[in-house]
Every structure is written in C-alpha cells, then in structure tokens.
Amino acid sequence: MKIKIGNFGNNLVSRPEGREAFLSARAYIIKKDEKEFILDFSGVEVLTPSWIDEFILNLKKEFNTAAVSYENTNNPSVKESLKWLSK
C-alpha cells in the first residue's frame, strides 16, 4: 500500500501532528491485513524527525510484520529526518 505523506501537509513538524496523521491513516486508509507500506514523500517541503518518528514507529508497532519502504526522498529535510530515524 502506498501512503502519500504529502497528503498530511507539506510542513510536517510536530510529534502530535505525526501521531494524528498516523491515527487518521489507520482509521481511513490502512487495511488491517497490509503486508507492505511504501511511504511517498512527494510534496513534503519540511519534515522533522519528531513527526516521522511518531508516524513510522506507530506504523511499525501496529503492523510489525509489514515491510516499510520510502520513495521520493530527495528533499534534504526528508533525507536528514529519515537518516536520523535509522540511528
């Protein structure tokens, strides 16, 4: 399943906003039996480690057997936030 992160806004900065985005995705987009997630960062101008940490950690916690990959990560803000998350 592809999730267009840019649909949650182009400036994604706070932990509470990341949590709200995950809860919205879980309620309205994600099916319970998903096996793979592709997070598409097109349209995102600013991304902070706090926002993406909250979104991805909740995604991995709830769907722990699903694979998670990323696309359209050329934006420096997105690159650095994902790099920070992988530490």
What are these regions (language model features)?
Residues G9:
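Active-site loop/lid in soluble adenylation, ligation, and acyl-transfer enzymes
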Residues L12-K35, F41-S86:
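Amphipathic alpha-helical interaction surfaces in cytosolic regulatory modules
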Residues M1-K2, K87:
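Absolute protein N-terminus
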